């Protein structure tokens, strides 16, 4: 396995991606290019949750994906720095596809909670010239082929996780109103796998429902999975990824979402 930290900072920021990828060895069959996933943990734009990073990457690696975890800038840094870092992360994976044994046409960007919001922003803004130009890339090089969003922050309206928007915008309410993913979806938004739990009290399930409605309205392919039980921040919904003392994070029904995502990602080819 090739496990290294790769800088993807913008304007002097310290953002990185950490690789968890299969690497050819002398005694192994030659690897064909594999699909990749850039994992974007949540944390309310206040921190980057380790429970939604490395454990998810290792699970994906075991399933045949080359995985990369983004450690991005959070408050007091404000929009659009984290988005630029994510764009650079995708560009880095795609432009080094041969080195990392990645299929450049099968790059998923996967986000959890506030990380899901950041991924959603890339989904709607990848084709805006200012974003690619700000990191000396092309729009095509930063476009995700698919998205996977787990209990994502989507709306800053009635179902908002307000802390995420305050941290992202520096409490700029007018800017927050411009960053509602469900209102930004256009024809170029990538097809998307969504999952949420109905009991999520921190980021209500309506966030995923609003995004699903927007995707349907624009004719964009999606798969929506709403599990009946589980608190916000479930990650893999196992004992290993549960927040300390939070038994509600351990949910057998939710544990199958990675395989459901992989089946959906493969079948959409």
Regions flagged by a language model, labelled:
Residues 201-210:
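Conserved alpha/beta-hydrolase "acid-adjacent" motif
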Residues 33-42:
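Short beta-strand element of the alpha/beta-hydrolase
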Residues 213-269:
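C-terminal catalytic histidine-bearing segment of alpha/beta-hydrolase fold enzymes
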Residues 91-164, 176-177:
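Primarily recognizes the serine-hydrolase "nucleophile elbow" in alpha/beta-hydrolase
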Residues 31, 50-68:
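Short amphipathic alpha-helix adjacent to the substrate-entry channel of hydrolases
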Residues 188, 194-196, 200:
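Short beta-strand/loop motif that positions the catalytic acidic residue
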Residues 48-50, 70-104:
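Catalytic nucleophile-loop/oxyanion-hole region of alpha/beta-hydrolase
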């Amino acid at each position: 396995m090739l496990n290294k930290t790769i800088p993807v900072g913008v304007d002097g920021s310290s953002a990185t991606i950490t690789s968890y990828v299969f690497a050819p060895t002398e005694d192994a069959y030659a690897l064909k290019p594999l699909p990749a996933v850039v994992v974007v943990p949540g944390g309310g734009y206040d921190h980057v949750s380790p429970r939604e990073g490395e454990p998810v990457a290792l699970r994906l690696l075991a399933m045949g994906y080359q995985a990369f975890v983004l450690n991005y800038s959070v408050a007091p840094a404000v929009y659009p720095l984290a988005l630029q870092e994510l764009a650079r992360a995708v560009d880095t994976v795609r432009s080094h596809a041969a080195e990392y044994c990645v299929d450049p046409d099968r790059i998923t960007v996967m986000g959890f909670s506030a990380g899901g919001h950041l991924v959603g922003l890339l989904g709607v803004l990848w084709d805006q010239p200012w974003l690619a130009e700000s990191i000396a890339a092309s729009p095509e090089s930063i476009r995700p082929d698919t998205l996977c969003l787990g209990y994502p922050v989507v709306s800053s309206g009635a179902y908002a996780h307000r802390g995420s928007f305050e941290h992202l915008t520096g409490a700029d309410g007018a800017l927050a109103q411009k960053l509602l993913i469900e209102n930004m979806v256009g024809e170029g938004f990538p097809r998307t796998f969504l999952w949420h739990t109905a009991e999520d009290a921190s980021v209500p399930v309506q966030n995923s429902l609003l995004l699903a409605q927007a995707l349907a309205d624009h004719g964009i392919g999606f798969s929506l999975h709403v599990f009946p039980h589980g608190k916000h921040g479930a990650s893999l919904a196992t004992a290993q990824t549960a927040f300390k003392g939070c038994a509600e994070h351990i949910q057998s029904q939710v544990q199958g979402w990675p395989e459901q995502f992989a089946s959906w990602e493969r079948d959409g080819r």
